[in-house]
Every structure is written in structure tokens, then in C-alpha cells.
From Swiss-Prot:
Pfam families: Anticodon_3, tRNA-synt_1g, tRNA_bind. Zn(2+) binds at C146, C149, C159, C162. GO terms for biological process: methionyl-tRNA aminoacylation. GO terms for cellular component: cytosol. The keyword Kinase does not apply. CDD domains: Anticodon_Ia_Met, MetRS_core, tRNA_bind_EcMetRS_like. Homodimer. Belongs to the class-I aminoacyl-tRNA synthetase family. MetG type 1 subfamily. It comes from Histophilus somni (strain 129Pt) (Haemophilus somnus). This is Methionine--tRNA ligase. Its cofactor is Zn(2+). Its EC number is 6.1.1.10.
């Protein structure tokens, strides 16, 4: 390791230990892995750790539903997670669990430090309590009628129709989603972290200029709304770590989860000599610390986590790198359409490096959603990697092997072209460093086109027919292989398996530093196929397999729901109504003329609808399900046309758009068959 190398610790968000890894998860882990592999190629001392997030009410309830102990559930899930990450070549130095001795010790130590420094407060709060299950109910395990807009079946913390936020005790007609019972109000002493005490420090962190602008802007919004003390405790029964010196209080999962980063690294330090835990986590640390996370957990990582570290006299992250969501063919991943694809399912049908390349080609440093367009996926992989990159090696290697026994020429045929390729090294490195992977890929593929143009113009297949041009043939084909070597070196962080096969063929190891050193008078190995074409049939098979797997999962959930209503996918049928009651509801086919996000709301989309003889403005709380509202323009929806207009903060809503699902990202707009027209009544 160079004496000038950087010391870096990188983490990914911890996958929750109650379900499988899917292609949405893989975006983050691939993004982080590419960055880590690049840093290794640059000679930096870097460690890459992660763990399963293994505590909380959902895990406790799912284990109970399955008839196993939570410890068994999380152990089984962890093995599957690790297999998925290994299959996608995610090169963790350590993968651990938050349910570990290291994490318990660190959680208790940080808690004691926060308490000692005066940042832990206690007070009595009133909570909803399930009398049948004898448990306090987290916000998301209570449903009822919104106290603001009177929308039914809303969660205990916010309304997905009007975007109002409220306390669970404000819900009208609340019910427990665990047992179906009507909860009662019960008092309990809770422990709070004094987040407002850190507003000055967090404001200064924003102004450092290192955070993504979108993150800094969002943090500023939270400051303007006012920071609140954070409840870090939960009452028994709960699966997690007990708060010291209490009888029935546990640390909230979001307190111990980020500390899991530290625990995984501490576990690594115990297994590998020469790594000093404190040199990475002490207040005086000069090491770099980066967290790769999704935008859905930005709140915890940009506010609570740095404040908690600062309050415990530990170092803060240098940065948090936030990414967007994955959509498939322009829509959110769908279980019914088979585009909710588990990592394990993908690995049964396709090469993981295809997805690594495609994600890299579309990733930038902003918090933008990434669309996995399956047609474009096939075309881009086959064009870039097979037709251009790998073909560059194969079309030259055959001549070198047959005519020159695998020996490359002792000089470059076109040194200016070689120097041009090497001159791009630092630009490409800069793109990698700043997570502008898409720009790096575009630069590399532009060089690939130049390399193929060189071979096309030199036409070695023509030169080979002239015995007097033997030396020229060796130099031209060697030059083609040299350019291939440089390109593979640049792509090694993205395509480690392809790079390993190329290294075996080239009979050399590729580092960022030695890319500039040509292989003159060098022996290469016989060429073997390096990469296979993507077949759309295999993708179609994968989609069908996903549909079947998702259907089986739903069936299993349905059976379990008989025993435990918390995991029921379907709500009970409402009380019967008369036909006259039904006819009072005027349902109409509506065409979406315009759709846009409401900037001030996390839930709402604003629609302008054509209902035949007039247009209507309607607000709908489906933003989480449809991340690209403009894609909805031109399609038909079903709306309640005779619902009384409701004045909202953002304007008048003149109806309601119908959708099915459980809320949040799990919502699906109702559609009509071809031929239906705007304004027609649904009967």
C-alpha cells in the first residue's frame, strides 16, 4: 500500500432481515462496489462493510407468523442475502448482523455517552395499545380514518390521500393491523434523543458543501419545519436490545441499525490484523467515511446519525451518497407483471455483469431514479460489450495465436493512438471518483469505437493474405489487443469477472497504474470466449419465473393471514350496501391531460383530467407509486366524478382517482380496455 494512500471506510444501507434482496437493492450495492473497486485499483486502503438490519416489530411478528424464533429467521435470511451479494460480485470485506455482541456493546456505549452528555430525555407519552396482543402499536401497525380529510384506511402517522401528518391517537376509528382489535390509550415512559440540540452542528454540516445539493436542500426544509426530539425507545414485546437499567424498554431499531456499520467494521478488525477501529471512528480520525443509501432513508442518515455520533464524541461521515429508486420499463417494479425481480431469480437466468454494466452506464451523482428498460438493456449490453469490446479482442487474437504463437509485437503500431487512450485515464478516474459512472462508461465506449475504427481501417484480414506484410500483421493485431487491454483496465471496477477472464487471456494483472505500460514482446494465452450475448428469451423466462414466485409468496402470505392478520394482503369486505347506494357513486372514465408532482408534498400528484364535457383538477396520493408523473399523461383512469370538491392546501380537488393496493408504493391505477372514451360512465 502506498504511503500516500487514503484510508477509507464505505458502507451500504443495511438490508432488512425479513425478506429477499431484489434488483432495487442491487442498485445501491453495485454502485458502492464499483466505487470501492476503483479505489482499490488506485492503491487506497479501503474497507467495505455491511450487515443485516435484524431488529424490530416486523421481524418479531414475521417470526411468530412462521412459528420460529426471530434469531432463526434472521440467520436464515442473512445466508440468503450473502449468497445474493456474492452472486453479483459485491466485494464486501465483512458482512455482519445488527443482532451481534459488537453491536450491543457499541449501542450501549453510545447510549451511555449521550446520556452522560445530557442528550437523553425521558417523558411519559400516551400510545395506542393492542389489548388482544398485549403490545404497544408502532405507527404503521395502526390504521383508521384520517382526522383531516376523513379518508379511510390510513396509517397511524400520515394520510396518503391528503398528505397530512398526525399522531396515531388522532385517528378516527383506529384498529390494530396485528389483531384487528380496537386499540386503547395507555401511558408509558419513553426515552428521547435531543435532536434539536444539534441544529447548529447540522447546519454547519450542510454548509460544508460536500453533501449532494438535493440532500442539503431537503435538510434545510426539515430545519424550517423544526427539529423534534426523537423517540429512541420501544416497549416490550420487542425484538432488539434492552435499554440498560430498564425492565421492559428496548432500543428502537433505527438507533441500533446505523451503529451496525460500526459493529460490522469492529467485527472485521477482530478478524483481520492491522486495522485500528479507533483510527476510523474517533473524533480525531483522518480516515474517510462514506455511506451509500437510498433516498427513502435520507432523514435518518442526514439528521439523527451525524447528531448521534457528534453527541457521543465520535466522528461524522465525510458524506452520504444518496441514490434514487429503480423502475422497470418506466414503471415501478410490479409483482403481478413479474418485474419485481429478486436477485436470486436474476442469477438463475442472466449474467450479473450485464446488470452491473447497465446500472453503471445509467448512474450519475444525482438522486435520480434509474429505469431498467429491458429492451434497451439487451441492446446496450450486446452492442457495447459483445459487438464492440469483446469482439475487439477476438478479431485480433486469432491472428496472434495462429501466426505468431501468441507473442505480441515488440513495438506499438500507433503510439499516438495509444497515448490518446492513456491520456483519458485521469478524466475517467475523476468520473469514477465523483460517482459519475455513466460519464465514465460513455468515455470508455467512445474509445472502444476508436479502437474498432483503427482495426477496420488497418484490416488485418487483408494484411494476412500478403506474406510480405507479416510484421505489419503482428503489429496491427498487437495494437488492437493493447487497446483492448487499456479498455478492460478502465472497466475493471464495473466488470470484475470479465476483467479476470481478460487478465488470464492477456497473461497479466490490470491495475490503474500499469494501464499505461504496453505489453511489448509479451506472451498471451489462447483466446477463449469472454462474454455471452444477452438473449431476450432468457429475460422473458426470468419475468415468468418472477410472476410465479411472487404469486407463491402471496399465497403463503394469504395462508398466514388466517393465523395473523398483520400479514394479510387483503382487507376484509365492507358491510353490504344496496344497489341504490351504489348508483349514488358516479364513476367516469377520465383521460389524463396533464400530471405533475406537487413539490410541497411527499405524497400528492396533481392531475388535469378530461371527463368528456369538462376538465377537472384532482389531487391523488400516489406519488410513491408513480415516480414519473409525466408518463401518466395520455392514459385513461377511473374517477369518482360526483365527490364533493375538497379545498386542499395546494388547490381544489374535484374528484377522486381510483387505485388498488395497500398504499404508498404499492398502488395501481385502474385502467380500461381499448375503445373506452373520456366521460363514459362506469356501470
Amino acid at each position: 500500500m502506498s504511503t500516500n494512500s487514503r484510508q477509507i471506510l464505505v458502507t451500504c444501507a443495511l438490508p432488512y432481515a425479513n425478506g429477499p434482496i431484489h434488483l432495487g437493492h442491487m442498485l445501491e450495492h453495485i454502485q458502492a462496489d464499483i466505487w470501492v473497486r476503483f479505489q482499490r485499483m488506485r492503491g487506497n486502503e479501503i474497507y467495505f462493510v455491511c450487515a443485516d438490519d435484524a431488529h424490530g416489530t416486523p421481524i418479531m411478528l414475521k417470526a411468530d407468523q412462521m412459528g420460529v424464533k426471530p434469531e432463526q429467521l434472521i440467520a436464515d435470511v442473512q445466508q440468503k442475502h450473502m449468497a445474493d451479494f456474492s452472486g453479483f460480485n459485491i466485494s464486501f470485506d465483512n458482512y455482519h448482523s445488527t443482532h451481534s455482541d459488537e453491536n450491543r456493546e457499541l449501542v450501549e456505549a453510545i447510549y451511555h455517552k449521550l446520556k452522560q452528555n445530557g442528550f437523553i430525555k425521558t417523558r411519559i407519552i400516551s400510545q395506542l395499545f393492542d389489548p388482544e396482543k398485549a403490545m404497544f402499536l408502532p405507527d404503521r401497525f395502526v390504521k383508521g380514518t384520517c382526522p383531516k380529510c376523513k379518508a379511510e384506511d390510513q396509517y397511524g402517522d400520515n394520510c396518503e390521500v391528503c398528505s397530512a401528518t398526525y399522531s396515531p391517537i388522532e385517528l378516527i376509528s383506529p384498529r390494530s393491523t396485528v389483531s384487528g382489535a380496537t386499540p386503547v390509550l395507555k401511558e408509558s415512559e419513553h426515552f428521547f434523543f435531543d435532536l434539536p440540540a444539534f441544529e447548529s452542528m447540522l447546519t454547519e454540516w450542510i454548509r460544508s458543501g460536500s453533501l449532494q445539493q438535493e440532500v442539503a436542500n431537503k435538510m434545510q426544509e426539515w430545519f424550517e419545519a423544526g427539529l423534534q426530539q426523537w423517540d429512541i425507545s420501544r416497549d416490550a414485546p420487542y425484538f432488539g436490545f434492552k435499554i440498560p437499567n430498564t425492565d421492559n424498554k428496548y432500543f428502537y431499531v433505527w438507533l441500533d441499525a446505523p451503529i451496525g456499520y460500526m459493529a460490522s467494521f469492529k467485527n472485521l478488525c477482530g478478524k483481520k490484523s492491522g486495522i485500528d477501529f479507533d483510527s476510523f471512528w474517533s473524533k480525531e480520525s483522518h480516515a474517510e467515511l462514506y455511506h451509500f443509501i437510498g433516498k427513502d432513508i435520507m432523514y435518518f442518515h442526514s439528521l439523527f446519525w451525524p447528531a448521534m455520533l457528534d453527541g457521543a464524541s465520535l466522528r461524522k461521515p465525510n458524506n452520504i451518497f444518496v441514490h434514487g429508486y429503480v423502475t422497470v420499463n418506466g414503471e415501478k417494479m410490479s409483482k403481478s407483471r413479474g418485474t419485481f425481480i429478486q436477485a436470486a431469480t436474476y442469477l438463475k437466468y442472466l449474467d450479473p455483469e450485464c446488470l452491473r454494466y447497465y446500472y453503471a452506464a445509467k448512474l450519475g451523482s444525482r438522486i435520480d431514479d434509474l429505469d431498467l428498460n429491458l429492451d434497451d438493456f439487451v441492446q446496450r449490453v450486446n452492442t457495447d460489450l459483445v459487438n464492440k469490446l469483446v469482439n475487439l479482442a477476438s478479431r485480433n487474437a486469432s491472428f496472434i495465436q495462429k501466426r505468431f504463437d501468441g507473442k505480441l509485437a515488440d513495438k506499438l503500431d500507433d503510439k499516438m493512438l495509444f497515448d490518446e487512450f492513456i491520456a483519458q485515464s485521469e478524466l475517467i478516474a475523476d468520473y469514477y471518483e465523483n460517482r459519475e459512472f455513466g460519464k465514465a462508461i460513455r468515455e470508455i465506449m467512445a474509445l472502444t469505437d476508436k479502437a474498432n475504427k483503427y482495426v477496420d481501417e488497418k484490416a488485418p484480414w487483408v494484411i494476412a493474405k500478403d506474406e510480405s506484410r507479416t510484421d505489419e500483421l503482428q503489429q496491427v493485431c498487437s495494437m488492437g489487443i493493447e487497446l483492448f487491454r487499456v479498455l478492460i483496465g478502465y472497466l475493471k471496477p464495473v466488470l470484475p469477472n470479465l476483467a479476470a477472464r481478460a487478465e488470464a487471456f492477456l497473461n497479466t494483472q490490470l491495475t490503474w497504474e500499469n494501464v499505461a505500460s504496453p505489453l511489448l514482446d509479451h506472451q498471451i494465452a489462447p483466446f477463449k470466449p469472454l462474454f455471452s450475448r444477452l438473449d431476450m428469451k432468457k429475460i422473458e423466462e426470468m419475468i415468468e419465473a418472477s410472476k410465479i414466485e411472487n404469486a407463491k409468496a402471496n399465497q403463503t402470505a394469504g395462508k398466514s393471514a388466517v393465523e395473523n392478520k398483520a400479514f394479510s394482503e387483503f382487507e376484509p369486505i365492507e358491510e353490504s350496501i344496496t344497489i341504490d347506494d351504489f348508483f349514488k357513486v358516479d364513476l367516469r372514465v377520465a383521460k389524463v391531460l396533464k400530471c405533475e408532482a406537487v413539490p410541497e408534498s411527499n405524497k400528492l400528484l396533481k392531475f388535469i383530467l378530461d371527463i368528456g364535457n369538462e376538465t377537472r383538477q384532482v389531487f391523488s396520493g400516489i406519488k410513491a407509486a408513480y415516480g414519473k408523473p409525466e408518463d401518466l399523461e395520455g392514459r385513461f383512469v377511473i374517477m369518482v366524478a360526483n365527490l364533493a370538491p375538497r379545498k386542499m392546501k395546494f388547490g381544489m380537488s374535484e374528484g377522486m382517482i381510483l387505485s388498488a393496493g395497500n398504499g404508498g408504493a404499492d398502488l395501481y391505477l385502474l385502467d380500461v380496455d381499448a375503445g373506452a372514451k373520456a366521460g363514459q360512465r362506469v356501470k
